[in-house]
């Protein structure tokens, strides 16, 4: 709201932290500077950045936002608990395998499974069939959502899975209260940029795998997601200096060490 008020008053700061959901809105209102000129001149070095990453912040072939890093959905797990249960996790489980392995882990250790009942898992399910969740919803198709909520119901009813009441109490959206932190669950779901924070807070060795897929998947649902963007305000009187900062933020090992990769992998 504060940024919107600043935009309306023509008082945007030189550099704006931008998100996918607002990029087109700000670009269409003429409030974002064209970054392509700084990329072409070499002020912002993109030689080691994939074209697809540049494209993620571009509209109609012009770059208006520079990705600060890339993330991927992940499942993180407690290595010691998994080893105690005598199970091995592949690089990517199916949801059915997650359920079965969760039962084994609960029987052997008493530690419960967490199933992501939110929109991220629903998006993954849609992607397993080569679709996208919001395209399905716009078309009135319910395939992904029906499959997802059937899975949510299955896990909610399982003794081996954390109950909805306890999950709400733990609040997995906050690192410090995630149920894996105190050993209530053996697994958790997040994005890869959160791994260091989760592992440090847990204070023990955690493994990482891809988000689960479905047993009938026709395509790999995993994807890279820009963590956040930086844009330069069109009203900025210091565009080149701002572009130099974006270059440092994106390419500097020093900067990434300071942030501990919190914004994603450069």
Predicted regions: what they are:
Residues 23-27, 192-205:
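A ligand-binding cleft/hinge motif common to bilobed small-molecule-binding domains
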Residues 36-49, 91, 131-153, 200-201, ...:
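Short, solvent-exposed loop/beta-turn-alpha elements that line the ligand-binding surface or hinge
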Residues 102-103, 138-170, 211:
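Glycine-centered hinge/linker elements that transmit conformational signals in sensory
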Residues 160, 199-265:
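Extracytoplasmic/periplasmic substrate-recognition and gating elements
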Residues 1-29, 40-47, 61, 170, ...:
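Conserved N-terminal structural module of periplasmic/extracytoplasmic solute-binding proteins
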């Amino acid at each position: 709201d504060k940024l919107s008020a600043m935009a309306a008053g023509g008082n945007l700061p030189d550099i704006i932290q931008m998100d996918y959901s607002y990029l087109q809105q700000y670009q269409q209102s003429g409030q974002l500077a064209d970054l392509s000129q700084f990329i072409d001149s070499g002020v912002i070095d993109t030689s080691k950045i994939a074209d697809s990453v540049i494209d993620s912040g571009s509209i109609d072939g012009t770059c208006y936002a520079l990705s600060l890093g890339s993330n991927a959905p992940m499942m993180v797990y407690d290595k010691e608990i998994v080893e105690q249960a005598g199970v091995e996790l592949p690089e990517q489980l199916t949801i059915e395998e997650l359920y079965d392995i969760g039962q084994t882990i609960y029987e052997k250790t008493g530690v419960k499974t967490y199933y992501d009942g939110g929109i991220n898992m629903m998006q993954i399910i849609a992607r397993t069939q080569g679709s996208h969740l919001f395209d399905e919803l716009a078309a009135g198709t319910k395939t992904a959502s029906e499959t997802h909520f059937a899975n949510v119901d299955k896990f909610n009813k399982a003794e081996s899975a954390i109950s909805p009441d306890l999950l709400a109490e733990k609040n997995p959206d906050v690192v410090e209260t995630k149920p894996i932190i105190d050993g209530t669950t053996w697994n958790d779901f997040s994005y890869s940029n959160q791994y260091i924070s989760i592992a440090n807070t847990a204070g023990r060795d955690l493994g990482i795998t891809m988000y689960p897929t479905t047993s009938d998947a026709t395509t790999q649902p995993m994807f890279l997601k820009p963590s956040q963007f930086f844009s330069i305000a069109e009203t900025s009187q210091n565009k080149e200096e701002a572009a130099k900062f974006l270059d440092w933020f994106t390419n500097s090992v020093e900067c990434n060490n300071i942030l501990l990769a919190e914004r994603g992998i450069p």
